[in-house]
Design a protein with these regions (language model features):
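Nudix hydrolase/Nudix homology domain
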Residues: 1-20, 85-86, 97, 155-199
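Conserved Nudix-box catalytic region and its N-terminal flanking loop in Nudix hydrolases
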Residues: 2, 50-52, 61-107
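Residue-level detector of beta-propeller blades
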Residues: 18, 23-24, 122, 147
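Acidic, metal-coordinating catalytic segment for phosphate/diphosphate chemistry
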Residues: 24-64, 68
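Short glycine/serine/proline-enriched coil/turn segments at secondary-structure junctions
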Residues: 27-28, 82, 130-132
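Unchanged
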Residues: 59-62, 67, 93-181
Length: 199
């Protein structure tokens, strides 16, 4: 990775570093837990808890956006639950009610980075954490993305984005900056898909 690009990347990371944490007493408004008893064949009964997000299962999409210049767009945002407090990954978000995964992918691209793809290719669908959630995620490769608007972020959403070559993404993974399972899985499938398409 070029020195100037690395400096720009680290500058963005530094902007989102946690400098102080204050615990507050507040009833959760987004997360809830549903407890149920399950009766299985073989005379087995289980009691399990399931996490719900905004009263839904929390199914989401993740998109690997690639420009016409073959650069991959990453997003950098505060992720206060992880060790260093800053997440580096790819555009992602929840699937809204009455929305298909494809529609959610296109919406999230426009909201988070202001880009629109010429082609959206499904890569893989997977359960995020089947032990406590029914969230079923969908990964996409977005080809020939073009800038069409400014970001359309929520008031409490802070996202910056940067473009990288495939080798630079691999470097960020090796350095531990991209470490979310959704991002890692989607990138591996996207990389393989792009390799096969070049043949």
């Amino acid at each position: 990775m070029r020195k100037e690009k690395k400096i720009e990347f680290l500058k963005i990371l530094n902007q989102y570093q946690i400098i102080k944490k204050e615990k507050i007493e507040k009833k959760p408004s987004f997360l809830s837990i549903e407890t149920a008893r399950y009766h299985l064949n073989g005379n087995i009964t289980l009691i399990r808890e399931k996490i719900k997000k905004n009263h839904k299962d929390g199914s989401a999409i993740i998109v690997i956006p690639v420009t016409k210049e073959q650069e991959i767009i990453t997003v950098i945002e505060p992720r206060v639950c992880i060790k260093n407090g800053v997440g580096v990954g790819f555009p992602a978000g929840y699937i809204e009610e009455n929305e298909t995964p494809e529609e959610a992918a296109i919406r999230e691209l426009q909201e988070e980075i202001g880009y629109q793809p010429e082609q959206l290719i499904p890569l893989i669908s997977f359960y995020q954490d089947e032990g406590i959630s029914s969230a079923y995620n969908h990964a996409f490769l977005a080809r020939n993305c073009q800038k069409v608007s400014e970001q359309q972020l929520d008031p409490d959403e802070y996202i910056q984005y940067m473009k990288f070559k495939t080798e630079e993404i691999e470097e960020l993974i090796q350095m531990g900056y991209i470490n979310g399972s959704n991002s890692l899985l989607a990138f591996q499938y996207a990389k393989e898909k792009m390799r096969r398409m070049r043949k």
